[in-house]
A protein has these predicted regions:
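Short linear capping/connector segments at secondary-structure termini
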Residues: 30-34, 93-96, 158-165, 199-200
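Short coil/turn linking the two alpha-helices of tandem helical-hairpin repeats
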Residues: 148-149, 155, 221-223
Length: 347
């Protein structure tokens, strides 16, 4: 009997020892926040919605490639491997593994994920949090407008997915547009989005009028033209926006935050990161390749240090001419003229 008691005591002591060791090893990780305990303060809400703004700017470059090179407005030319990559889009000879397509698709869903995080975890007990929630709905809707218009039936993801939900089927177009309409309508009617105070005032945040403009755009895609006219008229009649008179500088730093701009991504200028700077990227991608031009030195007073990925088509040029539009033509399409002189001196 005594041996049994001793054995039982040893077993009990052993269990207690291992249990206490496990407790010592089960230590909360320092410096790590969980979804459940992070999104509590206004500062947390600001950090969460900033992720939407940050991810959105990463959609611009691939979207610029796809939307322009798949259109009738321009074509790509050149012999480098990067130009050849652009030509795949221009000639519709790309496949589903094409990098710009994959990048845009992925980055749009990154925005949706960030928006879903805000809507899932940020509360509604302060003005800052309510604004973040309204902005998140606009970002989610804006991303889906891009996805639906380019892919047709992308997966509908309206919440942060669990591991067993990662494999999503194609979405239903009507359900997708319904989510877009709902998100934008709720954001507009919430009263929580910022608004410009005057024509010359500008905010880099999502505004009520920008959400209305997106809703109008969504209605156009859905061919609900009457609803589109109504909501777009509200933007015009707000008196907070107008056409920018200095058209030739609308895409330059001089034209930043102008009265025509509804929304701009704000970013830090970095001269060493050309493709990360949107205005620089447009200039470099679109402008002439100087090494491919046959002209004499005097004409190099004109800027020509681009890569030549995007060249306007003759049809695009003719459209400007047929409308008698000279100021927008001259600001949109750069032309090289040569004289009939014997020495071929450019004029």
């Amino acid at each position: 009997m005594k041996a049994k008691y001793i054995l039982s005591s040893l077993l009990l002591a052993g269990c207690t020892f291992f249990s206490s060791c496990e407790d010592n090893l089960d230590i909360s990780q320092h410096g790590v926040s969980t979804f459940e305990n992070f999104y509590k303060t206004d500062a947390d809400a600001e950090e969460a919605i900033i992720a939407c703004y940050s991810n959105w700017k990463d959609t611009y470059a691939p979207a610029f490639w796809l939307k322009n090179l798949l259109s009738d407005d321009c074509y790509s030319a050149g012999e480098s491997w990067t130009a050849a990559s652009a030509q795949l889009l221009s000639t519709y000879t790309f496949d589903s593994d094409f990098s710009h397509i994959k990048t845009l698709y992925t980055n749009l869903y990154k925005v949706i994920y960030a928006a879903n995080i805000v809507l899932q975890y940020v509360g509604d007990d302060s003005e800052v949090k309510l604004r973040a929630r309204a902005e998140a709905k606009v970002f989610r809707a804006m991303s889906y407008i891009e996805l639906i218009s380019l892919w047709g039936t992308p997966p509908l993801v309206d919440h942060p997915l669990k591991a067993n939900e990662y494999s999503q089927a194609n979405g239903n177009t009507e359900a997708l547009w319904a989510l877009v309409n709902q998100d934008l309508t709720e954001a507009v009617n919430s009263g929580n989005l910022e608004e410009k105070t005057s024509l010359d005032n500008f905010t880099y945040r999502i505004t009520k009028q920008f959400a209305q403009a997106l809703l109008g755009k969504a209605y156009v895609f859905q061919k609900n033209y009457g609803a589109a006219v109504t909501v777009l008229d509200e933007v015009i009649n707000s008196g907070k926006y107008d056409l920018y008179s200095d058209y030739e500088n609308i895409q330059t730093t001089k034209g930043e935050a102008n009265c025509e701009s509804l929304f701009e991504s704000n970013y830090v200028y970095d001269a060493n990161n050309v493709t990360g700077i949107m205005s620089n990227m447009i200039w470099v991608y679109v402008h002439w390749r100087g090494d491919m031009l046959a002209f004499n030195e005097p004409t190099q007073i004109y800027s020509h240090g681009g890569w030549g990925f995007f060249n306007p088509t003759k049809e695009s040029y003719d459209a400007f001419v047929e409308m008698g539009d000279t100021y927008r033509l001259n600001a949109s399409i750069c032309l090289l003229y040569t004289s009939d002189a014997a020495d071929d001196t450019p004029c």
